């Protein structure tokens, strides 16, 4: 299992990092080491710190992160119990920490009963909660937003856009371009030269469009 961390700044995608820290992997490590809850918490913190240290230095050092948007089944399960009766999509760090302390004191059997899930799924919930807790601490975020969407929602939205059934106001192509430029800065590329080459290449592409017959996707690939 793995986790993807994406950083947005004012609607623009800054970077995306895939981290080998999914809850399945964390659960296996905890079970293999036969750790206590406190030991498991320390191990998870160490693993997340190890994976995020470079990412944090490069992308978070000059940024103030206020919101963490969490997507996935484990956070939804935790959220439904934390949000009972409130009908809010956000969880404050104070509420999350209180709930985490409550969860940390539960046995596996108590976790099963509390969330009304089977043993296999119940064993994922503490590692998931510990992972989100550490992410809050590392980023300094004050609120977790839980929109309640799944991967299938994204697939359905992509299909609907391809079939012209819906139209997004957000530009995903611009996300790709911004991320590419941030990567170029990361590797100390000469930005004025890159911008001049990009501008010239796109002008040639656009002026010869009736001859080459290529579309918007090919133009995006050239721009990248």
Describe the function of each predicted region.
Residues 1-2:
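Active-site-adjacent helix-turn-beta-strand microarchitecture at beta-sheet edges
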Residues 7-9, 15-224:
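Helical "lid/coupling" subdomains associated with nucleotide-phosphate turnover
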